[in-house]
């Protein structure tokens, strides 16, 4: 199975399955002499891990990361950093009913058709549980970006179902508020509506989609490698690689269809840009403005409402998904999206520094 790595100079490779012994990753390209320990990584994992609130899956996992290599006496050595997270709260028996059935809307069918075999326990490799290691690697990238370049990568949930937050001025977002509620939401009035919606969904045994935004501030000018490794292209690639993501927007995204050139162009003065419709990227290269990316996540198909599907013999069957699942996968996707953004930014920063130097 290919496709387990991302990045060139800062390269992340993950391995492991939802109900396997452990998850792991190898991170290559971390510059030497950066102070690093598990304590630097754990906070982001705690934001993503299951069972932290009544709005997410009740599966309980400590998600305690262990650094295996690449750190000596509290500092990175420049060699590969290996990390693992052991799986604990496994209830594989919940998935016995789908051993020979395909869950609608999941990767069961495509994995079986491609490989002729699949780990049906919680989706195996296709489970969002794998993203724990992306968050671990992303925490390293975020730390280096913050300490060496002052770059901050943060995200917030902007919509669940038809409930939208109030329009946000990026420079005025209260990030303390975002981290102080289980929805990663900057709008307290929307938090209350999110709460009501999720409660109803759990009663109905149903799920819902979501939209979230990632903001990277203080990004240096010049990151991106036109024409095929444009910064926005690589960000879209990384964010689309997150489970359940069905759309990515950079800057104003699809809204540009209704804009005129006089409105959309980000005019400039000696003091800087007058707007940021482009989302901090022009010609595939960072402008120095905040980089803004928004992703849409589909509603999970793991619901208790009966649905039609087929089995391995292509016979029609009815399926009720058992196990423990999120009514809205977008809630826990915020730290994942932050991690993928940070991984791409650090990779491009190292590539830019290698070719052009940093001014």
Swiss-Prot record:
Report the superkingdom from the record: Bacteria
Query: Which Gene3D superfamilies does the record associate with it?
Result: Chorismate synthase AroC (3.60.150.10)
| Cofactor remark | Reduced FMN (FMNH(2)).
Instruction: Write out the residues that bind FMN.
Output: 125-127, 243-244, 283, 298-302, 324
Please name the PROSITE patterns in this protein's record. Answer: CHORISMATE_SYNTHASE_1, CHORISMATE_SYNTHASE_2, CHORISMATE_SYNTHASE_3
GO MF term list: chorismate synthase activity; FMN binding
GO BP field: amino acid biosynthetic process; aromatic amino acid family biosynthetic process; chorismate biosynthetic process
Task: State its Enzyme Commission number(s).
Answer: 4.2.3.5
Sorted alphabetically, which keywords does the UniProt record give?
A: Amino-acid biosynthesis, Aromatic amino acid biosynthesis, FAD, Flavoprotein, FMN, Lyase, NADP
Chain residues that bind NADP(+): 48, 54
Which InterPro entries does the protein's record reference? Chorismate_synth (IPR000453), Chorismate_synth_AroC_sf (IPR035904), Chorismate_synthase_CS (IPR020541)
CC terms in the record's Gene Ontology section: cytosol
Catalyzed reactions per annotation:
5-O-(1-carboxyvinyl)-3-phosphoshikimate = chorismate + phosphate
Pathway given for this chain reads: Metabolic intermediate biosynthesis; chorismate biosynthesis; chorismate from D-erythrose 4-phosphate and phosphoenolpyruvate: step 7/7
Q: Which cofactors does this protein require?
A: FMNH2
Is Cytoplasm among the key words of this record?
A: no
How the protein assembles, per its UniProt entry? Homotetramer.
Similarity remark: Belongs to the chorismate synthase family.
- Give the matching NCBIfam families: aroC, PRK05382.1
Role of this protein: This reaction introduces a second double bond into the aromatic ring system.
Q: What is this protein called?
A: Chorismate synthase
């Amino acid at each position: 199975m290919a496709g387990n790595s991302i990045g060139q100079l800062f390269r992340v490779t993950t391995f492991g399955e939802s109900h396997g012994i452990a998850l792991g990753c190898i991170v290559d390209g971390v510059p030497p002499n950066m102070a690093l320990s598990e304590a630097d990584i754990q906070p982001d994992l705690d934001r993503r891990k299951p069972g932290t609130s009544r709005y997410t899956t009740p599966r309980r996992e400590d998600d305690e990361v262990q650094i295996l290599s690449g750190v000596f006496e509290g500092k990175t050595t420049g060699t590969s950093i290996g990390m693992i997270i052991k799986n604990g709260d496994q209830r594989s028996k919940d998935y016995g009913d789908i051993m020979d059935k395909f869950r609608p809307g999941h990767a069961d069918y495509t994995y079986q058709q491609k490989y002729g075999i699949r780990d049906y326990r919680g989706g195996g490799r296709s489970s969002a549980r794998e993203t724990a290691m992306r968050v671990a690697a992303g925490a390293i990238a975020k730390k280096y970006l913050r300490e060496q370049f002052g770059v901050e990568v943060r995200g917030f949930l902007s919509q669940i179902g038809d409930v939208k937050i109030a329009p946000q001025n990026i420079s005025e977002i209260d990030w303390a508020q975002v981290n102080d509620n289980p929805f990663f939401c900057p709008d307290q009035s929307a938090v209350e509506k999110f709460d009501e919606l999720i409660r109803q969904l759990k009663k109905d045994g149903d799920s819902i989609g979501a939209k979230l935004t990632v903001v990277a501030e203080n990004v240096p000018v010049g990151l991106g490698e036109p024409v095929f490794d444009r910064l926005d292209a690589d960000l879209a690639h990384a964010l689309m690689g997150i489970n359940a993501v069905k759309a990515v927007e950079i800057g104003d995204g699809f809204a540009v269809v209704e804009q005129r050139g006089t409105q959309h162009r980000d005019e400039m003065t000696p003091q800087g840009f007058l707007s940021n419709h482009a989302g901090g990227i022009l010609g595939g290269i960072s402008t120095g403005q905040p980089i803004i990316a928004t992703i849409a996540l589909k509603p999970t198909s793991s619901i208790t409402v009966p649905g039609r599907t087929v089995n391995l013999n292509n016979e029609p069957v009815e399926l009720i998904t058992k196990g423990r699942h999120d009514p809205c996968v977008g809630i826990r996707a915020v730290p994942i999206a932050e991690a993928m953004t940070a991984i791409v930014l650090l990779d491009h920063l190292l590539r830019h520094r290698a070719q052009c130097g940093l001014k």
